[in-house]
Amino acid sequence: MEIVASLIKLFFGSKADKDRKQIEPYLQKIKAVYPSIEALSNDELRDRSEALKKQIADFIARDEADIVELKAKLELPETSLEEKERISKQIDETTKRIDEKIEEKLDEILPEAFAIMKDTARRFAQNDEVVVTANDFDRDLAAEKDFVRIEGDKAIYANHWMAGGNDLKWDMIHYDVQPVSYTHLRAH
């Protein structure tokens, strides 16, 4: 039986080989975009992250607006039961389409998103503090957490925090191969 398995692997490649071939384009794109991400200021890095979120929101905005309209029609007293069933089916189909569009957009932006995540981790691993222009999120977080403080118009994030009575320090930079998990899960 081992001979047959060896022959199959010889002619068709192993599962690991197939997985590597599948993720190689992502890895090359991440490596290509990473230097431009690494060159950004902390605020520019944050802006790029927000731009990715906006791309997703814009990509599904029309479908989300359609769902709002359909739900409003569902609530009208004059809407018949048959019409409510048809509208509910439309909502379900539109929700499914939104999920598919989100997956499509996530696949498209994965290299840049991963490069942003990796470089953010690098900044925290290599610096005791990461300083950005404060926004409402930072102010709200600073009111509740001790790893961020506000000084003037700046939010200062510490790379360490208390957890379970222990002072923990961020010291991890993501490996380029970590998108393997995402692409592998998406394929199966």
Residue ranges and their predicted role:
Residues 1-177:
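Helicase-associated low-complexity/disordered flanking segments
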Residues 183-188:
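Conserved small/polar residues in nucleotide/adenosyl-binding loops
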